[in-house]
Swiss-Prot record:
Localization in the cell: Cell membrane
Example of a GO cellular component annotation carried by this entry: plasma membrane
UniProtKB keywords: Cell membrane, Membrane, Plasmid, Transmembrane, Transmembrane helix
Biased composition (Basic and acidic residues): 471-488
Primary localization class, coarse: membrane
Residues covered by region (Disordered): 461-504, 617-636, 677-696, 932-952
Identification of the protein by name: Uncharacterized protein pXO2-14/BXB0013/GBAA_pXO2_0013
Bias kind Polar residues: ranges: 617-628, 677-688
Source taxonomy: Bacteria, Bacillati, Bacillota, Bacilli, Bacillales
Domain of life: Bacteria
Cross-referenced NCBIfam families: conj_pls20_p028
Record membrane topology: Multi-pass membrane protein
Amino acid sequence: MATMKIKEWFFQSKKALVIGILAVITLFVSFTFTPIAYAFDWYEFLGLKDVDTEKVVAFLQNEWIQYADFLGSIWQSIQGGIIKTLLYIVSALEGLIPDTFSFFDILKDAGLNDFASSIIKGLFYALFVLVIVWLGIRTIIQHKPPRFKSVGVNILVMIGLLGGLNELMADMQKMSTDFFSETTNTSKAKDGLAWDLVKQNTADLIYLSKTGFEPIQSKKENEPAISSTDSKPKNGMSKDIFLKAQLGDVVTPKVIEMLTSQKDIPKETEYLVYKITNDGDKETVEKINDSVFNPFKDKFPGGYVRYPMNFGTIFWGLLALGVAYLFTVFVFVMTIFEIAMKKIIAPIVFVTDIETGEKTKMVIQDIFKGFLVFAFTGLNLRVYTIIVNYLAEKDINAFLYIVAMVCLTVALINGSESILKYFGVDVGLKEGKNHLTGMVGGAMAAKGAIKGAGRMFSGAKNLMSGGSGQTREDTPKRSEMDSNHESAESQGEQKNTAKGGGMQAKKFARNTGAAMSYAANRGVGGMMNDAGNKVAETVGGAVDKGKEKVSGVAKGVSDSVKGTVSEFKGGQAEGKQKAQENADRQTLNTIGKGIQNNANAGIEPSASPKIANRPNVASISNERQQGNIKGERQTAEREIELQNKLRNTGKEEGKQGNVKSERQTAEREIELQNKLRNTGSTEGQQGNVKGERQTAEREIEIQNKLRNTGGTEASQGNMKSGSQTVQREVNVLDTLRSTGGTGTINSDAKAGVATIQRDVNVQNNIRGSEAVDSNVRAGSTTVQRDVNVQNNVRGSEAVESNVRAGSTTVQRDVNVQNNVRGSEAVESAVRAGSTTVQRDVNVQNNVRGSEAVESSVRAGSTTVQRDVNVQNNVRGSEAVNHTVRAGATTVQRDVNVQNNVRGSSEVTADVRVGTTTVQRDVNVQDNVKEVRKSRLRPRGSTQNRTDQLRRR
């Protein structure tokens, strides 16, 4: 029983028991073996008892001593393969340059020399005689004859050059080629500049372990030696040995042990069996074979890279040299051909230039410079290699090294400015670059031409073989190959026909027609204007590249021809329409610029601006008994800020009405963009003006103070509209006496800054039994007006007028009905501020017939549409029509007034006012029995009361 309990406890406490046992063992080991390990001589254990660790660490920290394991050996092999490839290519290009010198043999060619000799023999005497004759003529004719002394000297020089030109050119050739060879090949490395660059930046540890490590060791403290220019090289390899060597080889400890067994081996060779590690607080070394961090040491033992190299220096240097050699080949070949041409041209120049000798000197200089190109190009390449090796010796910043290499490469391609300045020889390789790019472009063009010819041949072969030209896309799927196979084939044929030449011809015809019509309608100036403003779109189209597949069906060809004609006509119509649109746009831009300039200069435009004849502009016609004006929808965008203060006063007087206005002030800043389109037509006996809804965006702040008094108004119509930004001050003074006449309104408009002042005083004097006076006052931001006018004159008619205004909407209907058999007088004065549109409408009708007058004006939120139509029937059947149109930024209003006299009529007017919307309905009916001419003096005269007040 006890045994079972012990076993049960053991299994339940198994985890805790194991942890306790491990803790006890750890404590025992730490207290027992730690002092022993601390007192242990690790240097003796690692075999470093007799080794100067500091010297070994300093030697192994050299940049040329690079430790590599299995992966490091692979990376070194990749770098070596890249360097070998570049060296092989650059060496091949470098070997082409001496081969280009073989083209100098053309100067010794028998054919070229025979050709030059034949030219000299055939032309020498003839040209020489002609030159002598010409000199004689010039001596006789010219005021200053040629200098015969210089002519004689030039003849002697000519004879010497003709006889010794070949020998002179041969000597120049030999000197230039020898100079190039001596500058590009040093006394130590005869394999060229490319191999010299690689040799100076590559080391061989096996070679250095025999000869000494001085070439890679620092000569000064804290100055690592990357390259050495001493007599001892870093390696003893030639170019062939380097190309065959395994650049990923690693020097293992076994190899070092074999080397150290030999005599006269440097002591530093023994250090290569160690690698750098640390003992916890400082760097130390350990033997490579004893390293526990190399799991592949049995199969791939670690060691030091045998062929360490400056990969970046060699890579960029070989790349720059390869580009330079490639361009140099083109430069040398072109220079040799130019020298050969100068050899042919030189004798002709010598004979014809015996007067001054300037051209002879020029030819000799050009030949001399041509040969100097070879010599100085070699010098330029050699200096480049020396500077690259110098940069490799210095321990400089990586960024500065890259900048220096880029500058050196650019200088190598552009050439030395010093050589160009002092010798006049351009040793740059820009011409070679241009020739190379031209050759590449020509090769690409030839390749494209070959492909195009192949496509043409393939298409012609398909056409001649009677093939339908069906493509993979046109082939029906297997699931679609059912009973409708025949219809599918017919659809495929139609598709192929459309994709063939028919569609191409139609497209070409359409584009051609559009281009011709556009050019004919716009002209050269219009086309240039469209191109400058980027308005016109590209009309012409190039014929698409590709295959032209024609099915050969006669019906398809016929349809294609017909379609081509129709497409050409359609293109003409499109071109004409496009030209008209561009012309209209140009006209609108011109008008807009003129209005803007006038507004900036403070010039007020005329009251009746001219509008271009457009099919969308309204036209109003008159008839004797019928008149109706309808306005189509107008849209605009406005941003308005308003502050209005209005105060109106009115009083009731006797039979004669007198209207006096007090000044009203307001400040407005308006920016308008309006697009107006109005149409008008005439209808029955009564005129009705209806405005459709107008939309806009406004931001308005209004402060209004209104006080209105009702009275009588006379009938006289006059409307004046200005631009959007108009400043007017209008003074109207009408005087009507009781002798039975009708007063005239005199209005004067002046522009202010941003203020609107309006005084409206209405008094009604009626011989009937009723008179209505209504005062409407509005607060700062809300306008509410109720106007009720009832007049009973000689009959049973009643007139009602209700004016109601909301907070943000203004609607005004004014209905005035006057039956007057006496004389009335009406005075109205309206003054406007600087940027506000001021409108004066004065209507006077003296009618003895049965006419009726009705006028309705409604305006939307941001767009005002007003049609003004005045018809007067006076003692007969005459009709008067008055239309006022505004400019580009001006509000247009149409007012229709008809007078009905001696009858019974009823007038109803609703006026509603809001802050941001103005809607006005005006209906005026007057029954007048007497007609008199206006006695108001014309504006501008000395008797005019308004002008007199203004002068004061």
